Amino acid sequence: QAKEGLARAGFAAAAGICILAVALICVFLFANGVPAISEIGVVDFLLGTKWKPGNDIYGIFPMIVGSIYATAGAVIVGVPSGFLCAVFLSRFAGKGVGRFLSNGVELLAGIPSVVYGFFALMVFVPFIRNNLPGKGMSLLAASLILGIMILPTVITVAKSALDAVPKRYYEGALALGGDHERAVFGVVVPAAASGILAGIVLGIGRAIGETMAVVMVAGNNAVIPESIFSGVRTMTANIVLEMGYAADLHRGALIGTGVVLFVFIL
């Protein structure tokens, strides 16, 4: 009983530390960001289309739009591929192929974001610049690399959800005359829908919060993009690019951007 009580105390302490960390982050963000937002004006801050710190003009609407567009592009690129890969690994791949691909997915998850950004800078940006409109550093380049970066999250969570579906569901579908593909997509996938959706949501959170790779390839123009070939600046990129030299209201506006980003992720 003493060991059990000690274990419970340890688990409770770990949970308390996690809760305290989240609470402290919230307190820091809101205590420093909300006053700046109030001073600027909520409407001017959220819907303003100009970001000019030198003139004390802080409108983050272009960054909000940029974050939404980049995340939407990442979802379009990464979610279908990740979902189909998860289905293949869970229900179609043999043991050898499945193990090899699973190791590859784990490797993707461990690659630093700066390496992804360097890859996009060396591959995607020149390709877009030489074959498509624009200068290469664009919303399209950011969306492509973000789509690749969310693949491990989507694949891993979706595969776990598919693996957790009881075998009797699949066997029952076969007993009713369905073939393998129909049993998988008609019975197993719907049964795992909540877990697959969780993987997609986690992938979206990863895309919204990603910074370094986006900074390297997005162009970082603080304007609303006119097309996928235009440069774009996300909220995270805005914070990283300017926090090093920001002061006073400028610094508060950047922390306020963090508040908006925090609400987005929630």
Where do the PLM segments sit?
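Periplasmic/extracellular loop-to-transmembrane helix junction in inner-membrane transport proteins
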Residues: 2-10, 30-74, 94-95, 241-252
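Interhelical loop and adjacent transmembrane-helix boundary motif
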Residues: 214-262
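Cytoplasmic-entry segments and transmembrane alpha-helices of multi-pass inner-membrane transporters
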Residues: 8-9, 81-120
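Transmembrane alpha-helices
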Residues: 157-158, 180-216
